[in-house]
Amino acid sequence: MYDVSGRGGVARSVVNLANRLADHRDVRVVSLHRPSARSTYELDPRVSLEVLVDAAAASPLDRLRRRRPTALRPVPAEKHMTRLTDRALRRRLASLEPGVLVSTRPSLHLAAVRWAAPGVRLVGQDHKNFSTRFAGPRQPEVLREAVPRLDAYVVLTHADAEDYHRELPGLTTRVEVIRNALPWAPAEAPAPLASKVVVAAGRLANEKGFGRLLEAFAPVARDHRDWQLHIYGEGPQRGALTEKVRRLGLDDQVRLPGYTDDFRGVLAGAATYAMTSRAEGFPMVLIEALSVGLPLVAMDCPRGPGEIVRDGKNGFLVDDCDIAGFGDALRTLVEDDELRRDCGRQALADSHRYTADAVLADWLTLLDDL
């Protein structure tokens, strides 16, 4: 993976999986970088960590290599991949002993199929949806070379699996659907849902669509002055979102608290979870909301929400980009306490599909079959 110390969903899901696999396998996490000495997500002591590039200990020649883009073509230029990481990756992959290597990004899939030692079984794990991957610069070329040479390719939704088979006719690589697991066990009882707080979370960036959420919430907020919207996270759109809150007259009803170290507690204290992302891979926040019995309102963006939200059962699934429809669904849960509680009970029941044990069983089956 690129960076085990990151705050993002990839780091979280990798650490969760590694920790669970440690009960059954010898596990090592190999991180290209580790810019922060303190990781957001804690590895089990039985999981060994190896960092390939130590920026602090770089020689003058290594610093020069770090400024030059990767030679691993057709990987596009990106900050994580440089001549320095090329050198470290090639050496480490060539020295691997027989076992299973799981790579987490298209560029790492390509490095694995080109440079891994003989006898290593190769599994690619994708944390983004097919449409996003194939829209990126040069990524289709990378995937068209790498995926057919992998032993298995793990995607997050059935729709993504179908897309890969359609895009790569005759593909013999085993394409497996394995969802990300909950980082904690489901609650014993649903949240009380009495707080009159709608919660959302994610990077404050365009792809998360929080501007759409503010527009959908505004008419509901005008009719229900005792309800609030709390959007957790940080990112480049904080200023723009703050200004939009002001323009919509929502200063007293919308908060942007930043990051929280107790996201489960935040969810358990809310009444509804809202998602208006423009694209997702498999949104962890939705299954985390399910796990405390929180009803969902989500736009059916590509991909993920459509395979998690059961419309009218554990919440409401709204057509992508339908801001008015999203506001109507939100209003329904705000105004109907009994429906909100019914959806919350179903949400908690549905969360058991994503427990660590359920997802671990899928991974162990795959690893045993390779």
Model-derived features with residue positions:
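N-terminal strand-loop element at the rim of the active site
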Residues: 1-7, 20, 24-76
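A conserved mid-protein helix/loop that constitutes part of the nucleotide-sugar donor-binding site
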Residues: 8-16, 196, 200-225, 229, ...
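Short His-centered aromatic/hydrophobic patch
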Residues: 82-85, 103-109, 126
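Carbohydrate-associated surface elements
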Residues: 159, 181
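Aromatic "clamp/platform" in nucleotide-sugar-dependent glycosyltransferases that forms part
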Residues: 259, 278
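Short hydrophobic beta-strand element within catalytic cores of glycosyltransferases
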Residues: 295-299
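Conserved acidic donor-binding segment of nucleotide-sugar-dependent glycosyltransferases
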Residues: 310-312, 316-324, 331-337
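A short, well-ordered alpha-helix in the C-terminal region of glycosyltransferases
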Residues: 325, 332, 339-353, 362-365
